[in-house]
Amino acid sequence: MISGFLHDIQNSGITLVDIGSSGSLDAKWTPIKDLIDLVGFDPNEEECRRQNNLPSQYRSSVFLPYAVHGKDGVETLYKTRSIYCYSLLKPNKQWLDRFAFHDLFDVQEECPISVRAIDQIEELKSYSPDVIKIDVQGLELPILSKAGRYLDSAFYVETETGFTANYEGETTFAELDRFMQANGFLMFDINPDHRISRNNQLKNKPTGREQILWAEAVWLKDYVALDRQGKFDELGVDQIKAKKVLVLCALQRCYDFGFELAEFFARKGLISARELAGLETADGWDLTRAYPADEPVAAPRSGKMAMLADLLGLLPDRLRDAIHRASAR
């Protein structure tokens, strides 16, 4: 069962690199929060200092004061009417003005800001990520194309990407999909429920069929395909790494893919036949079974709470995080 793997990886933990960090993670990470070593990036040095002085919610956490980019240098930060639309890319106003929320992207100030290429950040070099979470308003490709060994190490990548260029030069979902597949990743989850009304007299009469402008997606590495291509990293995936991968499959509830990987790892001698047998049923993948009955784990919501959760799900990650922080005060 997956519960045994949680014990086996306690000493190594699961390294999660959060580029565009808000300081905390979604509730979906709760079942493994005590295993997570969080490395967050926020260009606000004061906020990083504040976060680093707080007790960690996870196994460990550190926040680094860098604006991550595809290169070292100085770029322009476009400060918009809404802080949640700030970007190192200029808003594509000709396009955005067609939508009801266009005023959120009105540029109020342009400021120079130092940026760092991810492969040049010294403090990150001692880490081998298992998870990369990236929310950077259109800079996914410049950053991930420089991620090198970090992307090689990662099994799980979470992105938030536009289907169209909401910013000038923005990475679009189609471009990201090609890049991720070329690097051995497949999409396993998507939340496209970000529909925005056109800026006309019908904007306050939504039908739920408005245009989808962006989506969060989860990408998992396909070790089976990489092995068939002669690209499987025999040295980079040891017994502990294999068990981390399977725990992440359990967290994502990708039991079928997880079992395919478990069979692959068993053939490679990375898990035992007994461990494989423990994963042959859905119950064997259930992370909630790894906790005592009195220990809370994120549970399904119903009624009004479910409706509220669905409404919050329509908001960008950073805005949701701000609401959660405000409600906790």
What residue ranges belong to the model's regions?
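Phosphate/nucleotide-binding beta-alpha loop and adjacent structural elements of enzyme active sites
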Residues: 1-329
